[in-house]
Protein backbone atom coordinates (compact mmCIF):
# COMPACT_ATOMS: atom_id res chain seq x y z
CA UNK A 1 0.00 0.00 0.00
CA UNK A 2 1.45 3.36 -1.05
CA UNK A 3 0.96 6.51 1.03
CA UNK A 4 -1.38 9.16 -0.35
CA UNK A 5 0.46 11.97 -2.11
CA UNK A 6 0.77 15.15 -0.07
CA UNK A 7 -1.00 18.33 -1.09
CA UNK A 8 2.39 19.88 -1.81
CA UNK A 9 3.22 17.12 -4.33
CA UNK A 10 0.16 17.95 -6.42
CA UNK A 11 -0.08 21.08 -8.54
CA UNK A 12 -0.97 23.88 -6.11
CA UNK A 13 -4.43 25.45 -6.35
CA UNK A 14 -4.08 29.04 -7.58
CA UNK A 15 -5.81 31.41 -5.14
CA UNK A 16 -6.23 34.99 -6.38
CA UNK A 17 -6.16 37.40 -3.44
CA UNK A 18 -6.92 41.12 -3.49
CA UNK A 19 -4.96 43.32 -1.13
CA UNK A 20 -4.11 46.94 -0.48
CA UNK A 21 -0.70 48.29 0.53
CA UNK A 22 -1.42 48.27 4.25
CA UNK A 23 -0.81 46.12 7.30
CA UNK A 24 -3.71 43.68 6.75
CA UNK A 25 -2.01 42.48 3.56
CA UNK A 26 1.18 41.56 5.37
CA UNK A 27 -0.16 38.13 6.38
CA UNK A 28 -0.85 37.12 2.76
CA UNK A 29 2.52 38.38 1.62
CA UNK A 30 4.43 36.80 4.52
CA UNK A 31 2.70 33.45 4.08
CA UNK A 32 3.70 33.46 0.41
CA UNK A 33 7.28 34.53 1.22
CA UNK A 34 7.59 31.66 3.72
CA UNK A 35 6.08 29.16 1.28
CA UNK A 36 3.22 28.40 3.64
CA UNK A 37 0.72 28.64 0.80
CA UNK A 38 2.57 25.85 -1.05
CA UNK A 39 2.72 23.77 2.15
CA UNK A 40 -1.07 23.79 2.12
CA UNK A 41 -1.40 23.03 -1.59
CA UNK A 42 -2.10 26.65 -2.55
CA UNK A 43 -0.42 29.19 -4.78
CA UNK A 44 -1.24 32.69 -3.56
CA UNK A 45 -1.49 35.22 -6.39
CA UNK A 46 -1.64 38.56 -4.60
CA UNK A 47 -3.11 41.45 -6.58
CA UNK A 48 -2.51 44.86 -5.02
CA UNK A 49 -4.97 47.73 -5.45
CA UNK A 50 -4.80 51.31 -4.15
CA UNK A 51 -8.35 51.36 -2.79
CA UNK A 52 -11.19 49.03 -1.90
CA UNK A 53 -13.27 50.48 -4.72
CA UNK A 54 -10.44 49.59 -7.14
CA UNK A 55 -10.69 46.03 -5.81
CA UNK A 56 -14.42 45.96 -6.51
CA UNK A 57 -13.91 47.23 -10.07
CA UNK A 58 -11.70 44.18 -10.69
CA UNK A 59 -14.25 41.73 -9.30
CA UNK A 60 -16.45 41.31 -12.43
CA UNK A 61 -13.31 40.35 -14.38
CA UNK A 62 -12.70 37.61 -11.77
CA UNK A 63 -9.26 38.98 -10.90
CA UNK A 64 -9.65 37.82 -7.31
CA UNK A 65 -11.79 35.55 -5.13
CA UNK A 66 -10.79 36.46 -1.57
CA UNK A 67 -8.97 39.27 0.16
CA UNK A 68 -9.01 42.15 2.56
CA UNK A 69 -10.73 45.48 2.09
CA UNK A 70 -12.32 48.33 3.99
CA UNK A 71 -15.77 48.74 5.48
CA UNK A 72 -17.37 50.86 2.76
CA UNK A 73 -16.19 48.59 -0.09
CA UNK A 74 -17.50 45.58 1.84
CA UNK A 75 -20.96 47.15 1.91
CA UNK A 76 -20.82 48.26 -1.73
CA UNK A 77 -19.58 44.80 -2.77
CA UNK A 78 -22.47 43.12 -1.01
CA UNK A 79 -24.97 45.41 -2.71
CA UNK A 80 -23.46 45.32 -6.22
CA UNK A 81 -21.84 41.90 -6.48
CA UNK A 82 -23.37 39.78 -3.72
CA UNK A 83 -20.01 39.45 -1.94
CA UNK A 84 -19.75 38.09 1.59
CA UNK A 85 -17.96 39.29 4.69
CA UNK A 86 -16.42 36.19 6.24
CA UNK A 87 -14.41 37.78 9.02
CA UNK A 88 -13.16 41.01 10.56
CA UNK A 89 -9.40 41.23 10.96
CA UNK A 90 -9.38 44.29 13.18
CA UNK A 91 -11.52 47.24 14.22
CA UNK A 92 -10.04 50.44 12.87
CA UNK A 93 -13.00 52.65 13.72
CA UNK A 94 -10.99 54.61 16.27
CA UNK A 95 -8.46 55.70 13.61
CA UNK A 96 -11.07 57.15 11.27
CA UNK A 97 -10.97 60.85 12.04
CA UNK A 98 -11.20 64.23 10.39
CA UNK A 99 -7.66 65.62 10.49
CA UNK A 100 -6.62 69.28 10.52
CA UNK A 101 -3.45 71.24 11.06
CA UNK A 102 -2.81 72.89 14.47
CA UNK A 103 -3.69 76.38 13.16
CA UNK A 104 -7.09 75.39 11.70
CA UNK A 105 -9.86 77.73 13.02
CA UNK A 106 -12.18 74.72 13.51
CA UNK A 107 -10.06 73.74 16.51
CA UNK A 108 -11.15 76.89 18.36
CA UNK A 109 -14.86 75.98 18.36
CA UNK A 110 -16.08 73.09 20.50
CA UNK A 111 -19.65 71.97 21.04
CA UNK A 112 -21.35 74.04 18.31
CA UNK A 113 -23.77 71.12 17.88
CA UNK A 114 -25.18 70.23 21.33
CA UNK A 115 -25.80 66.64 20.16
CA UNK A 116 -22.02 66.29 19.76
CA UNK A 117 -20.53 68.38 22.61
CA UNK A 118 -16.95 67.28 21.88
CA UNK A 119 -17.11 67.93 18.14
CA UNK A 120 -14.75 70.64 16.97
CA UNK A 121 -15.70 73.20 14.32
CA UNK A 122 -18.75 75.16 13.24
CA UNK A 123 -20.36 75.94 9.90
CA UNK A 124 -18.47 79.25 9.83
CA UNK A 125 -15.06 77.61 10.39
CA UNK A 126 -15.62 74.80 7.88
CA UNK A 127 -17.71 76.19 5.01
CA UNK A 128 -15.68 76.78 1.84
CA UNK A 129 -12.66 74.85 3.14
CA UNK A 130 -10.91 72.13 1.13
CA UNK A 131 -11.31 68.47 2.11
CA UNK A 132 -8.89 65.87 0.76
CA UNK A 133 -10.47 62.43 0.58
CA UNK A 134 -10.72 59.11 -1.26
CA UNK A 135 -14.09 58.51 -2.90
CA UNK A 136 -16.29 55.80 -1.33
CA UNK A 137 -13.94 55.11 1.56
CA UNK A 138 -14.45 55.12 5.32
CA UNK A 139 -12.59 58.44 5.25
CA UNK A 140 -15.22 59.81 2.82
CA UNK A 141 -18.04 58.50 5.00
CA UNK A 142 -16.53 60.03 8.15
CA UNK A 143 -16.01 63.37 6.44
CA UNK A 144 -19.63 63.39 5.24
CA UNK A 145 -20.87 62.62 8.76
CA UNK A 146 -18.69 65.40 10.17
CA UNK A 147 -20.21 67.88 7.71
CA UNK A 148 -23.70 66.62 8.50
CA UNK A 149 -23.12 67.17 12.23
CA UNK A 150 -22.30 70.79 11.37
CA UNK A 151 -25.42 71.18 9.22
CA UNK A 152 -23.33 71.20 6.05
CA UNK A 153 -23.09 69.03 2.93
CA UNK A 154 -20.31 68.28 0.48
CA UNK A 155 -21.63 71.16 -1.65
CA UNK A 156 -20.65 73.58 1.12
CA UNK A 157 -16.95 72.69 0.92
CA UNK A 158 -14.34 72.07 -1.76
CA UNK A 159 -13.95 68.33 -2.34
CA UNK A 160 -10.63 66.99 -3.69
CA UNK A 161 -10.78 63.26 -4.48
CA UNK A 162 -7.38 61.48 -4.49
CA UNK A 163 -5.88 58.07 -3.89
CA UNK A 164 -4.99 57.50 -0.20
CA UNK A 165 -1.25 58.02 -0.70
CA UNK A 166 -1.91 61.25 -2.60
CA UNK A 167 -4.13 62.52 0.23
CA UNK A 168 -1.28 62.09 2.72
CA UNK A 169 1.33 63.60 0.41
CA UNK A 170 -0.88 66.58 -0.44
CA UNK A 171 -1.78 67.24 3.20
CA UNK A 172 1.90 67.00 4.20
CA UNK A 173 2.70 69.50 1.43
CA UNK A 174 0.23 72.02 2.87
CA UNK A 175 -2.60 71.37 0.41
CA UNK A 176 -6.14 71.22 1.77
CA UNK A 177 -7.63 72.25 5.08
CA UNK A 178 -9.07 68.91 6.21
Where are these regions (language model features)?
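Short, glycine-/small- and polar/acidic-enriched structural segments
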Residues: 10-154, 158-161, 177-178
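Short, low-complexity disordered leader/linker segments with a strong preference
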Residues: 1-13
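Pocket-lining segment of extracytoplasmic ligand-binding domains
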Residues: 166-178
Amino acid sequence: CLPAPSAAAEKPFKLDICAMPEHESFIFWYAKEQGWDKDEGLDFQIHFFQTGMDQLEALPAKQWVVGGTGTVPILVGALRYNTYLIGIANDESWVNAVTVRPDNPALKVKGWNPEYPNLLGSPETVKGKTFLYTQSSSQHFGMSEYLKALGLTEKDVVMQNMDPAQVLAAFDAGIGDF
